[in-house]
């Protein structure tokens, strides 16, 4: 019988092997990203355009079976686009919550520096506290 630690190592090696079929030459990045995901942490990837950051995020979500969302940040992205918002359902007369992009297992925030400070704060709150405030 395998010990839990050996099982985690074997599964991690299998995951990395699957990812290497899609992402070539980024072994260190794959390893650190997998470690961050397993630790329920966050990772900041900085690189020039076109080197596969989005492809890597999609590959991780598929290999690990995680839900995935991506937002291309611009100055017109609102905090409610990230956290969600309530809208009136005119047929029932009730308010319904529409989930924002951050409600997923793996979220890619592309060009976060272009967002307004309020939008950045909404995302950072969700990251730090693992929850967020949304008006209902």
Language model features: what each stretch is:
Residues 41-42, 67, 103-107, 129-135:
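Loop/turn-to-beta-strand initiation segments
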Residues 34-75, 88:
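Walker A/P-loop
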Residues 25, 45, 82, 110, ...:
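Residue-level signature of catalytic and energy-coupling elements of molecular machines
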Residues 103-128:
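Conserved AAA+/SF3 P-loop NTPase catalytic/coupling segment centered on the Walker-B
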Residues 32-35, 88-112:
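Conserved alpha-helical scaffold flanking the Walker A/P-loop in AAA+ ATPase domains
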Residues 46-49, 70-72, 90-99, 129-136:
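Conserved Walker
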Residues 6-51:
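Pre-Walker A (pre-P-loop) alpha-helix and adjacent loop at the N terminus of AAA/AAA+ ATPase modules
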């Amino acid at each position: 019988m395998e010990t839990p630690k050996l099982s985690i190592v074997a599964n991690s090696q299998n995951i990395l092997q699957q990812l290497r079929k899609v992402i070539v030459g980024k072994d260190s990045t794959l390893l650190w990203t997998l470690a961050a995901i397993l630790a329920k942490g966050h990772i900041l990837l900085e690189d020039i355009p076109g080197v596969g950051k989005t492809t890597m995020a999609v590959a991780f979500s598929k290999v690990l079976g995680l839900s995935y969302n991506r937002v291309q940040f611009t100055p017109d992205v609102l905090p409610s686009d990230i956290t969600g918002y309530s809208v009136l359902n005119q047929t029932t007369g009730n308010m319904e919550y529409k989930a924002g992009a951050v409600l997923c297992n793996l979220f890619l925030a592309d060009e976060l520096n272009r967002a307004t400070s309020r939008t950045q704060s909404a995302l950072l709150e969700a990251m730090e506290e693992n929850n967020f405030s949304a008006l209902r």
